[in-house]
Amino acid sequence: MYHINNTKRYATLFAFIIIVLFAGCRSTPQLKAGEGYVTVKGGKIWYRILGEGKQTPLLMLHGGPGGTSKSFYQFASLGEDRPVIIFDQLGSGRSGYHTDTTLLKVENFVEQVEALKTSLGLKEFYLHGHSWGTALALEYYLKYPKGIKAIIFNSPYFSTSLWKADADTLITTLPDSIQLAIKTGEKNHDYGSPAYKNANEVFYKNFGVRKTKLTSELDTSTAKGNEFIY
């Protein structure tokens, strides 16, 4: 009888351990739609969770640096399948504004992503980067690869020198007046002049977003990017 009782005890204990182990190995806890802030070095970053789908979350990294997550509202419909996590990197959008050059280091941007991941308890997730966000995604993966199921590189930017060489080639195909405005603005470091802004708009209309920008009913944020950081 003692042997039988002990066997039952061990079986019960074993079952309990298995349950605990499975609970400990569970994937990311179910995220709820909403927004909040996470404290990081230099201030707080704003984030928003779109949707409460059951599949693996998607974490979005916007471009810039100095851009915002505003355009990511176009991905809101994906929230029916999985939580879509957007946030504004420190210094722009709804996150703490700053012009502190000591904070403009890649490692600080990487730690912002890690702080958000930790705060939300993400165990597994997909990482999406756009433009500068692709470089940030790569840098983040090199330091914190655990939990990343895949990375999506959208309009990738991995090298400033290569990007500039490509841009210079494209600029030569634009009208002379546009080329002159760009050359003058960059020579004088005057990126706010009407001529330069117009030339920049022409460049992106030709080589960036060629179609009418998509809109979202959620796209109501008036938070702006940070030109100083950019």
Which residue ranges define each predicted feature?
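C-terminal motif of bacterial Sec signal peptides marking the signal peptidase cleavage site
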Residues: L21-G24
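Active-site loop/oxyanion-hole signature of alpha/beta-hydrolase fold enzymes
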Residues: Q89-W132
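Conserved HGGG/HGGXW glycine-rich cap/lid loop of the alpha/beta-hydrolase fold
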Residues: G42-Y97
